[in-house]
Amino acid sequence: MALAHNLGFPRIGRDRELKKAQEAFWKGELDEAGLRKVGRDLRAAHWQAQKDAGIELLPVGDFAWYDQVLTHSLTFGVIPERFRGHDGAKPTLQTLFAMARGVATGRSANCCGGAHAQEMTKWFDTNYHYLVPEFTVDQQFALSWEQLFEEVDEAKALGHAAKPVVIGPLTYLWLGKAKGGDFDKLELLDRLLPVYDEILNRLAGQGVEWVQIDEPILVLDLPQEWKNAYERVYNILQRAPLKKLVATYFGGLEENLGLAANLPVDGLHIDLVRAPEQYPTILDRLPAYKILSLGLVNGRNVWACDLEKAVDVLRHAAERLGDRLWVAPSCSLLHSPVDLGREDQLDTELKSWLAFAVQKCQEVAVLAKAVNQPDAAEVAAALARSRAIQAGRASSPRIHKPAVQARVHAIKPGDSQRQSAFGQRIAKQRAGLNLPAYPTTTIGSFPQTPAIRLARQAFKQGKLTEADYVEAMHSEIRHAVQIQENLGLDVLVHGEAERNDMVEYFAEQLDGYVFTRFGWVQSYGSRCVKPAVIYGDLSRPEAMTVAWIRYAQGLTRKVMKGMLTGPVTMLMWSFPREDVSRETQARQLALAIRDEVLDLEAADIKIVQIDEAAFREGLPLRRSAWPAYLEWATEAFRLCASGVRDETQIHTHMCYSEFNDVIESIAAMDADVITIETSRSDMELLEAFEKFDYPNEIGPGVYDIHSPRVPSREEMVKLLRKAALRIPAERLWVNPDCGLKTRAWPETEAALVNMVAAARELRATA
């Protein structure tokens, strides 16, 4: 008999109830009892939804008030000194939210005064962010937070078969950072393990039969000493009197396969969506007593599973494993929207191609039933439906566009190369643009005021005519251009008032994208995103930005930048297709953006910026796979940027803080100017560009837009002088480190006044 289980369920709620409750609590509009009730109701609803879908063993402990790693930090007592209560008091929900969000100076809280939040970073290669644990050399661990045990009691009281979910000790340590000294995090292991042992024994005392221990770092390139630690850790943890399932996901085990298969635990979960090739080897290597959980339903995307293909694997596995076979999604469904049933405006055909978390649980249950009751009418009907969906998608003219495919096949190497080398281009650009030394510009967006958002909303709802909406946006553009001229900026932007989001704005205008109404997923805390879905071949029916930029250019004699989002970022921040490669989708996007770049050039726009905020995010988890990704990602950028004349200057913007290991690929993009985020690192990031001898022009961000603080002219002069020690002055631009969309106008203007003054001071002393 195959058993249907789940690794984790989205916590936000069908209508983002958790987000709304969190934000009401932070504003003081909801008390703690009210917040806790929302959490309790959501957990009960989610467990019931999974049970109704046919899941037999339910994940418990996957709920978090902000982030699951942060929950573990509280559980283990890993609470930085700045958040600790008086006299060793137990942490509270206020402590948890303070660690996540920081505490403003002067605000009284029962745990801390002014304290900056913990660092946040990407959860492996997903678009979810976790709060990075902070470890000190003398770090002590102690069970300090009862949430897991309370939730197990809740689930059992509701009559559910509960499988608690905990992050494994080695993955938890790997995810954290050593603070205040150079020490090896592995040295903390012996202090941490007794807490795990205590947790497992308490769960056993609650009547728990199985616990899921997540060890996703087993799909990474691990140092030998971390590999060596695994067997020792699980030899210690096996003493606890309950069964343990080690869960791996987001990739294949590769050289860690033997290690994972032979850990002294009762079961192993593997991801067969990301790494189907590991299936035969794991089947041969798994000890005869051990459960094998096969992740066959994609937990990270929105497409309906090809049930027939999955059933073939399962029936083969059942012959070998018998009752030792479990079925699950590939990973936690945290990364999937909640319930496709909420979507009331998708057309029937397209909706039939999709599956959200509830539907993925139903798919898992049907797969288990296909093994256990192969002749059941329900199984036959589900397989027939799945076959029809797969056949329909394979031949649908909505998906497959011969003209787009022909254009991709016709791409020649020369299409992704500029006409001349940078040295020749820049000479022509300088002559044509006639900019001063240390030219000043901004990254693209200006403050999105309530008036802008209201106008956009009214237009979408049909309450504002198109003519009135265009005039409202023109008014905002006039305002932005006037302010920039008054400030004395050299290269202007139109301010992006008409754009809701840097991906959504373009996706709405491209064929091959569709939008859901309720396809929300958690990014972090209360922040939810609703990625667009790429369902078919991508193309641009008509110009997307030209009218706005042309209008802005008509208001000034200064140079106006065109502003676009690059192909890699468009892809990374969407739910991609599964029937063609990411490389193919990136090329289709690149061709669509290339058309827009050429239209901007034809409209006499002399500078076009193509943002690639997510370029680094696309890097695979294993370094061996980096070269292939970097090759197609840089080629996609060059393809969208290389159709223009030498005289047209291409800019790109990247907002992250690690360039050393991808600097060659950034150079290979061959943008004439790259603007980057460097202010918080005090220009140290430029070391990578200096060492590599980066040949093109650079705009290192001279102030941090994420802070409302207005930096002084002197600070920016100092940063620019530092930059000029690493990068020749004639190749330096002066700009903030990111777009100004989230800031208010007064602080924006004040900061830009000082930035322009700093550039002028440097020109005067050059």
UniProtKB/Swiss-Prot annotation:
UniProt: L-homocysteine binding residues = 443-445, 496, 611
Q: List the active-site residues.
A: 706 (proton donor)
InterPro entries recorded:
Cbl-indep_Met_Synth_N (IPR013215), Cobalamin-indep_Met_synthase (IPR006276), Met_Synth_C/arc (IPR002629), UROD/MetE-like_sf (IPR038071)
State which pathway it belongs to.
Answer: Amino-acid biosynthesis; L-methionine biosynthesis via de novo pathway; L-methionine from L-homocysteine (MetE route): step 1/1
Q: Does the keyword Zinc apply?
A: yes
Domain of life of the source: Bacteria
Q: Where does Zn(2+) bind?
A: 653, 655, 677, 738
Q: Which Pfam families match?
A: Meth_synt_1, Meth_synt_2
Q: What cofactors does this protein use?
A: Zn(2+)
Q: What function does the entry list? A: Catalyzes the transfer of a methyl group from 5-methyltetrahydrofolate to homocysteine resulting in methionine formation.
Full protein name: 5-methyltetrahydropteroyltriglutamate--homocysteine methyltransferase
